[in-house]
Amino acid sequence: GGQGTSLHLSGELLNHLHKIELVHVPYRGAAPAIVALVANEIQLLFDNSMSAIGHLRGGRGKALGIAARARLPAIADVPTLDESGSPGFEASIAHAVMVVNAVPKPTVAVLNRAVNAAVNDAEYKAAVTEFGVTLIGGTPEHLMKFLASERAKFADIIRKRNVKVN
């Protein structure tokens, strides 16, 4: 990923945890980064499952580990980075539905129920799981707690690794 993206920060987290110095090479998206990996211009890539899984299944790359808490059913033979010797390594990409603060709480509750219904729909869940996506529903409070935790973890990495954004 580009400078300061979640994928870049994943690499910096690995650098920090293992006291190594991987060189970050910024790309404008996953496609050119994967082309560089396949062409052996780079030797390592952090990518999200949605863009990587087709290339992995096609034999154009090898997954060394999943940066999530648990293995992904779509590529269950790939261990987590925690299992591979990076204890506690977790750097997943999260997507959330958010609204401005002015939206009334009853409206937020209706939206939250609708999103959770979609997340828990068996057909939808099966379709996205095939691409390595793990769906997690919850409450707005749960989301805010998660975001605060991620912000704290990566703010620390940004400071310690002196990450700059262009």
Where are these regions (language model features)?
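Conserved, function-defining micro-sites of small-solute handling proteins
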Residues: G1-N166
